[in-house]
A protein has these predicted regions:
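Asp-based, Mg2+/Mn2+-dependent phosphohydrolase catalytic module
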Residues: 2-32, 39, 43-44, 48-115, ...
Length: 168
């Protein structure tokens, strides 16, 4: 797959993604980054809006959810167990290891899957290299210097992707 830092879809938040949008793109498997996409790095408690979105989406029969995280801590599996969600940790994004494992687990081709995350250099690049639809969302929190710096470095790719989308 091509090496691309440009997301296919940009959304403000994970909660902005609707079943209708995903169905229109023929997405049957939605892989979700965890940190700063579902919850901030500093807590494992989602906002009420995020909790409601996860619950609603997890009840859908035609779109499956799986958290695909680079985290190697117990917080992701614990979060998922409490909410009836599946997860893959140690995903090693941007390598396709965790993404391919998820596709195989669900028996879904890459063309019918998407990965949502807040980072271009891990989530978007990993999704694009694996051939799944990349969806970039705003980070929930830029609580330290390195997160702010990373987002500044990602800004040119975001602007190019937005400009490309406006021309379509």
């Amino acid at each position: 797959m091509p090496l691309s830092f440009l997301p296919k879809i940009i959304a403000k938040s994970l909660t902005d993604l609707t079943p209708e949008l995903l169905r229109s793109r023929k997405i049957r498997l939605l892989m979700l980054d965890f940190d700063n996409t579902i919850v901030p790095y500093t807590t494992d408690v989602p906002t009420p809006e995020m909790a409601a979105w996860l619950e609603k989406m997890n009840k859908l029969e035609d779109i499956r959810l799986c958290i695909v995280s680079n985290s190697h801590k117990d917080r992701v599996p614990t979060f998922c167990r409490e909410r009836g969600l599946d997860c893959i940790t140690y995903a090693r994004k941007p390598s396709g290891k965790g993404i391919r494992e998820c596709l195989s687990r669900y028996g879904v081709p890459a063309s019918e899957a998407a990965l949502v995350g807040d980072q271009i250099y891990t989530d978007t690049l990993g999704a694009n290299c694996a051939g799944v639809t990349s969806i970039l969302v705003d980070a929930i929190s830029n609580h330290n210097f390195w997160l702010k710096a990373r987002h500044v470095l990602e800004l040119p790719f975001i602007l190019i992707a937005r400009n490309r989308r406006m021309k379509q």
